Amino acid sequence: MSPVKLSTLAVILGLVFGLPNIYGVLKPAAFGAMLRRFPRYTPVGYVLMLAATAWFLANLKQESISDFAAFKPFLFGLFALVGVGACLFVKDFLPVRGLAVFWLVLAKLMVDTARWVDTDWRLVIVIWAYVWVLGGIWFTVSPWRMRDIINWGTATEQRTRALSGVRLAFGLFVVLLGLTAFRAAEASAVAAQ
């Protein structure tokens, strides 16, 4: 069972994903410059990588698969070393790698939370999670691709504004789903008990 309701998660995800893009719509040049700095801004990379590593380790600690019970302490130490080691020895594109790992653990939460909500609209969250899984895998292996995508997306003010508008609209759509469809599905599940 997920620690958060899908309606709450959708509102949080929609706001966090959408609201920064208001800046991109209003001031595309400044927003584009900020985005172009992201792939090599190492302080953000430390935060993202360590937060994602801690979250992954928390997930591992809660895992109860008996096949891995004997290896769990070893795996815990190994993954902690990998997360910290990435911060120390793989600083090139560390923010991209940290974001990629964060997307992977966030996608797990999204899928786990959406699993039992009885509405087809949950597929919006599930598909979004799988997009993040694919992006997480791809950007972990080839983080320079995010730099290239950001450079393409911010090449002109018009493109930056348009893409920011699309992301803002999607974020608001997810918020709307959280306030309507997901909340209604959760209420009917409670009423049916």
PLM features per residue range, with description:
Residues 136-151:
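Transmembrane alpha-helical segments of integral membrane proteins
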Residues 29-41, 64-69, 89-96, 151-154:
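Membrane-interface helix-boundary motifs at transmembrane edges
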Residues 14-24, 49-59, 80-83, 106-113, ...:
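Helical transmembrane-bundle signal
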Residues 173-193:
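Juxtamembrane boundary at the C-terminal end of a transmembrane helix
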